[in-house]
Amino acid sequence: MQHSTIAAIATAPGAGGIAIVRLSGPESYEVAAKVFRPANPAKKVADAKGYTAMFGAFVEGEEAFDEGVALFFRAPHSYTGEDVVELSCHGGSAVARRLVEACIAAGASPAAPGEYTRRAFLNGKLSLTQAEAVMDIISADGRQGAALANASLNGALARKIAAQKDALTALQAHLAAWVDFPEEDVPELSQSHLCDVLDGVEQELDALIQSYDAGAVLREGVDCAIVGKPNAGKSTLLNLLAGFDRAIVTPVAGTTRDVVEQAVQLGDVRLNLFDTAGLRQTEDEIEAEGIRRSWKKLDEAGLILAVFDGSERPTREDLELAQRCAGRPAIALVNKEDKPTRFDAELIAPYFAMVLPVCCQEEGARKVIAAAVARLLGTNQIDPHAANLSGQRQLSAATRARDAVAGALDAAKGLGLDAVSVCVDDALDALCELTGENASEAVINEVFERFCVGK
């Protein structure tokens, strides 16, 4: 597939040691020859072999405005599958912008967001799931999230899906031969073999789907509401998890009146923390609005850390909070473990996934909470090198495929082989959409709209 030659800055904006301007397309070498002058006059850009580098000056007309390195990649052995030249100049926005402008003046076109990776996909260098993994790596905050994305980039998901497609395709070929050519001596599939194959595929797809939520937490983080009565220790907990004094802590009840936000990395999970106003009855209109927002954050959160004062007996507000947490991903933290305990944790235990005695003023509580969060969200069970689904597009396609296979299983037990064949076709279509083999232009556009310019 022939494209124009494109140019864009591939590195993050701002000051830095180097910036990289990437050229890709059939005229990459011609454009590079107009903006890069090798330090060794005997060397010519047009003659550069793939996987080689040259030192020289970046020029605009006859004026040299910087010096750096040009890296050369010959098609198809490049990221995009096209001729690629990467020009490494000094960092900072002024020089990099001028270099891009020089490339455009020399015949290149400005790259659109995600155009390099889109070309890699269209040229068969990456599957659609691998292309999505590129964006996941760029966006990753934690080591495990980056490892999950890297596994997909290296083809773990593509291989897993290919194995299921192969099993279904072999099954479908046998079904088609038996249905379409009844006069031929094609052995009929036994129901047990048919069900075994379908059941195996369904289990593999279901395992992928079941691991999605934990994988999404590792990649994207989770919104976490810190809730509780006034002076239970919510802001102290926020400061403990943040590692600095993010919120004001005083003995005065109602100090926190609005939601205080802070993103933290807790183990392998990024938590978007929301420290909320203390929950109690009040006539103060401002505090009442803060409490309304507290309940709203609790209802919206993907994780709840409910803080209780362990030095006091449970109150009506404590029990109301516990009941609101029932059936939610919530951990009860009975705070002030360093003081005599008067709180009966058994009263709230039925409403929480786990109840932990802690002292939010002690650093050790951070590790205890991190381990509990990992257990509750299932991130401690994730194999970062295994196949995993990323994003709603992949989840939706995998779910449709799983449901179609389940339909084929039901059909195999009584509706006949024609019905089985229809369901298997639906499953294969969904799996091909997942990998991008038959994804619509709208789906492809949606994937690459997430990318930045230069990637």
Spell out what each predicted region is.
Residues M1-A147, A151, G155, I331:
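A glycine-rich (often HGG/GG-containing) alpha/beta subdomain
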Residues F55-F65, A70-R74, G254-T282, E300:
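Switch I (G2) and immediately adjacent beta-strands of P-loop GTPase domains
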Residues L273, V307, L333:
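Generic enzyme active-site microenvironment
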Residues Q2-I9, P13, R143-Q265, T282-D284, ...:
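C-terminal-of-GTPase-core extension/linker across diverse P-loop GTPases
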Residues E287-S311:
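Inter-motif core of Ras-like GTPase G domains
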Residues A242, A277-G278, G302, D309, ...:
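Short glycine-/small-residue-rich Rossmann-like dinucleotide-binding loops
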Residues L271, L303, I331:
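Short, Asp-centered acidic motifs that coordinate Mg2+ and/or phosphate
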